[in-house]
Amino acid sequence: MSETLPRSDDLEATWNFIEPGINQILGNEKNQASTSKRVYKILSPTMYMEVYTAIYNYCVNKSRSSGHFSTDSRTGQSTILVGSEIYEKLKNYLKNYILNFKQSNSETFLQFYVKRWKRFTIGAIFLNHAFDYMNRYWVQKERSDGKRHIFDVNTLCLMTWKEVMFDPSKDVLINELLDQVTLGREGQIIQRSNISTAIKSLVALGIDPQDLKKLNLNVYIQVFEKPFLKKTQEYYTQYTNDYLEKHSVTEYIFEAHEIIKREEKAMTIYWDDHTKKPLSMALNKVLITDHIEKLENEFVVLLDARDIEKITSLYALIRRDFTLIPRMASVFENYVKKTGENEISSLLAMHKHNIMKNENANPKKLALMTAHSLSPKDYIKKLLEVHDIFSKIFNESFPDDIPLAKALDNACGAFININEFALPAGSPKSATSKTSEMLAKYSDILLKKATKPEVASDMSDEDIITIFKYLTDKDAFETHYRRLFAKRLIHGTSTSAEDEENIIQRLQAANSMEYTGKITKMFQDIRLSKILEDDFAVALKNEPDYSKAKYPDLQPFVLAENMWPFSYQEVEFKLPKELVPSHEKLKESYSQKHNGRILKWLWPLCRGELKADIGKPGRMPFNFTVTLFQMAILLLYNDADVLTLENIQEGTSLTIQHIAAAMVPFIKFKLIQQVPPGLDALVKPETQFKLSRPYKALKTNINFASGVKNDILQSLSGGGHDNHGNKLGNKRLTEDERIEKELNTERQIFLEACIVRIMKAKRNLPHTTLVNECIAQSHQRFNAKVSMVKRAIDSLIQKGYLQRGDDGESYAYLA
């Protein structure tokens, strides 16, 4: 360069002065340094400053000159010429400079492009500094005047590169880039650095003329991203199809994860963040969606194998596309439901097989025996087994996934409430699932003192609550539970009050205080009865004529009639004379404390203990647990060894049916001998009943009361069996029907109350809306059928609470 700076008003001289410097800054064939540090070392500081000064002098001089104006052909505006001429010179120079690039035979276009791009962009930065004064004043003024075709020098370099180098050759460049991507996917060595630089150039060339600071990815997206995504889909479509022909689906799942891992790594190294989402969607389509049926089938195979690790891997793959989760949830729900149903069917089949080995029964009788002799523990444990298996799979493979959690709940609710045992084929639509009753019996086994430790060792209150949450007929469970709970309370057979209270609290937490209201009140009655018993015992001991012989121990229970599952039936019965003094004193004592209250005596539910010294001389007396009716009969034998049925009737005032039912256990265990024997003679007045003296039995403590619970004729002639091997009869079926009737009545009352509440608030409602709201409100207690709601509506219309609208499809509330 010349040692003398050019005249500041001479454009040609100024350009001729700075052109060699620009050439040196941008580089030539011999000067292709690829980093800023290397370029800085090559450039002469003196030359750099002279270029800057010459440009500065020219722009300043022109700005001071007057009368030098130019009219812009695009806008028609006049501008002081402080840079436009030298700007145009530079623009033309850059075009020619880039056009003169030559690709060698030894390099690919990608290599050529990247090498030139690196040097050119470094030079553009230095050049931008050299033209700093023009950028800050002339360019900025032009752009502020709305001339968006004027750019700072660095941007001008990039725009020229795009126009001259990139646009004509972009297809070649992109094809070579995509070839490199394919080679990388095939595990071959690729030009990693060149790929990265070329991609960055595409981002850099996305310039928005209206706003140079705004990121514009239009070039990157249109030129590279779209063909890249298309190529990706084509490549992996072919790859996955070929892979699945030679490998198992399980192997494919792990391969798909590896592909995704590699592509995500490449994403962070090469591609712009904008590609992340569309690339993920493209991979999801070709790796997952296109093979979803195979993956769903494999899901079933893995569930069969209970292979949690592989299920987790499959879920991790499928969840990448959230739209596929409902399909996976549907497969999971159907599988769990079917498995639960099959497990119960297998349990029943095994149970039937065991019965057939021991009994010769016709199909109808076999079905009845199976239904009434299946162990509640076996049944509930089988339900829990299925639930626990799939809960574990859920918790370890896809925790917190809402659709799959819902699928598990739906499936468990389905097979727990509806299976071959709970609702056998042909059951009426109004039938209640037997699961509620079986869970109540399971609870009874757990909470009963008499249950052997080895039986209860693997049972817990958690089991009860787990199944309870899935019950659709929670009111049926409450009814059965309350009946068994009542027996435990009045017979004192509960393991402990704490255990009972714990279950009540957990049931309350799982449902509502209202749900356990009756059970809680029953518990309170027992506590108050204990206080009454203690007070009565103290009062008796204060009697002047007190003796244990005159006042035997008495354990009274005072129960609220509408809370307990016992229906009062007046029974003609003469209380044994040995119990009359205690009975009279109790009535007197209670009346004094609770004036006006009426006591109704439930004689059929009373039990007691008798000491019988009727064994061989020297043997300890027997302890008999008996019903009150049995006690009344046995006490008659203090005065005679042989009694006729007529004698017993006179002594007890009991009906023949009650006497016969009480006698069955005595005859069965040979405490009493019937003469003549046989069913027909059992109910004849002249039949004699002789007490066995001396009585021979291995046990000292004998429970005769338990044998009274079944129908007399069935007990003697054979029939079904309960869970403990006792013979079953018609009373059991009658009791089931009675419970079902009670449930239906309570449900009718509940639904009517629901309808009144709803209609009182809404006043007028269409039929469908009323039915749906009523079903929704009853969901926590039972699964209300439409027919049940219709009956309740009809009942309320008859009672005058509702009236049908003129359209026949709506109802109005009558205040």
From Swiss-Prot:
UniProt subunit comment: Component of multiple SCF (SKP1-CUL1-F-box) E3 ubiquitin-protein ligase complexes formed of CUL1, SKP1/HRT1, RBX1 and a variable F-box domain-containing protein as substrate-specific adapter. Component of the SCF(CDC4) complex containing CDC4. Component of the SCF(MET30) complex containing MET30. Component of the SCF(GRR1) complex containing GRR1. Component of the probable SCF(DIA2) complex containing DIA2. Component of the probable SCF(YDR131C) complex containing YDR131C. Component of the probable SCF(YDR306C) complex containing YDR306C.
GN (gene name): CDC53
Free-text description of this protein's post-translational modifications in UniProt: Neddylated; enhancing the ubiquitin-ligase activity.
Region (Required for interaction with SKP1/CBF3D and F-box protein): 9-280
Record organism: Saccharomyces cerevisiae (strain ATCC 204508 / S288c) (Baker's yeast)
Single GO MF descriptor: ubiquitin protein ligase binding
Family membership: Belongs to the cullin family.
Role noted for this protein: Core component of multiple cullin-RING-based SCF (SKP1-CUL1-F-box) E3 ubiquitin-protein ligase complexes which mediate the ubiquitination and subsequent proteasomal degradation of target proteins. As a scaffold protein may contribute to catalysis through positioning of the substrate and the ubiquitin-conjugating enzyme. The SCF complex associates with CDC34 as the E2 ubiquitin-conjugating enzyme. The functional specificity of the SCF complex depends on the type of F-box protein.
Record's keyword terms, sorted: Cell cycle, Cell division, Cytoplasm, Isopeptide bond, Nucleus, Ubl conjugation
Other comment: Present with 377 molecules/cell in log phase SD medium.
GO biological process terms held by the UniProt record: cell division; cellular response to methylmercury; G1/S transition of mitotic cell cycle; G2/M transition of mitotic cell cycle; mitochondrial fusion; mitotic intra-S DNA damage checkpoint signaling; positive regulation of D-glucose transmembrane transport; protein ubiquitination
The protein, known as: Cell division control protein 53
Localization per record: Cytoplasm; Nucleus
Cross-link (Glycyl lysine isopeptide (Lys-Gly) (interchain with G-Cter in NEDD8)): K760
Keyword Signal appears in the UniProt entry: no
